[in-house]
Amino acid sequence: MSPSLMVYVPAIVCLFLLIHQVRRKRTSNLSLPPGPKGLPVLGNLLDLDGRQPWITFTQWASTHGNIIYCRLLGLPVVVLQSQEVAKALLENRSSIYSDRPPISTRKAIGSEFNTAQLRYSDEWRLHRRIFHQSFRPEAADAYLPTQLHKAHQLLQGIIETPERYQRHIELFASSVIMSAVYDYDAKPKDDPLLLAADKAIKVFVEVASTRTAIILETFPFLLKLPAWFPGASLKRLAIQSQKNSAAMVDIPFRYARERVMTATSNRCMISESYERIDVQNNADEFELALKSSSATAFIDQTASTLIIFVLGMMLSPNAQKRAQAEIDAVIGTERLPTFEDRSSLPYVEAVLRETLRWHPVFPLGLPHYTSDSDMYNEHYIPKGVMVVANIWAMSRDEAKYPNPNDFNPDRFFMPDGQLNDDTVDFSFGFGRRICTGKHFANASLWIAIVSLLATFRFMKPLDDDGKEVDPIFEWTTGIVSHPVSLPCRVLSRHPGTTTEKLSDIIELSV
């Protein structure tokens, strides 16, 4: 090294250290979003309601505002409590907020297939493009006849066994997905593929809950314990989730692929996607992405939302009567509603919106993850933190939704009697991670709701003295929230309606 260069080396080193110190000081002086104080190591984990963490987050908003910072077992989390903040960050700055947290346990719990959990990458873009091509609004309309047919099957199932209405709703939601994605016509009763898919999803949403996911991510050794080891319940749950998910991904895909290859498949996501496949360019990669993205469709909110709709109708009989009166006035009783009637039934539309708002089935959605640091309203949001959109808090915004715990479809009407422009899209997520199948899901929800309202009354259960009582039930835990075993008296609106008579009405409606 020359003497002249040796003179500059210390100066360069000092300059580097000075710049580093200035940057470090500048970062340390930046203010993180406000939030509750936590304990060492545990952070705020013990403060959370383990079954309904969104309730705790919403309570924190009243003290700390619409953007808060907390730590859960050492993991930094930013919670967005209002639509305004969520849109400002997750949509307007989507280049920073479109990633997902790095989940090292994805393989262990069998969620590698899940497009929604993929990191923001070329792999995710391929998955999303495949799904979007089949379920974008103009493409999803091709499935309307299938959704109508499945809604009619739902009615027939409930007429036969009204006490199993919740199971019929679950079968409706799954069978619509199976038909649209795999061209699989599910059996009305106890279809093996539907049962396998339902079992897989129920275990997955439990193991993927916020609290469980954080525990597994912080203490991954829990998944390395022998399944027989005392206290290894999470390990056993992960094994069950992995096994169930593998069956849910592989079996229906093999069925659909075989039908495509033998030219016996009707239009569905799989057949459409194979028509677009470029055999000269990563065909294997495309097929793997197709198999995974198609299975992601099972993580659907339709069944959960419809069960919440039933609860809303029981607890708000006036809303139920008004919706049914509108249907009778527009359509009559000689046929069932179709999609062509949708624009003529604004109150039914308001019932759907209120169902989505009243109890969001994904109260926290899925967490985002910052790919870079950011500043918002003088608050510093570091790179590499989990960002959660608290959908529940947004649904409880009293400035926008007065008396938010009431089921009140009237809140979606303007003074002139027209529907307002609030379609409750926040329930489907934000930014580039918004649910790509929301148009398809919305259509399934509407045709099911309007068909159920046209055909049945949803009444509170009776006590031993024959008096109506409020239903007693529990809510699911995990990333999806809906009533479990919701007691309800489902009665035909037209006494004497049999399966045969309903079939005749259905024939007049198609």
How should each PLM-predicted stretch be described?
Residues M414-I447, I472-T477:
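Cytochrome P450 heme-thiolate "Cys pocket" and heme-binding signature region
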Residues L45-T58, T63-G65, A247, E334-E378, ...:
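Conserved cytochrome P450 K-helix E-x-x-R motif and the immediately C-terminal K′/meander segment
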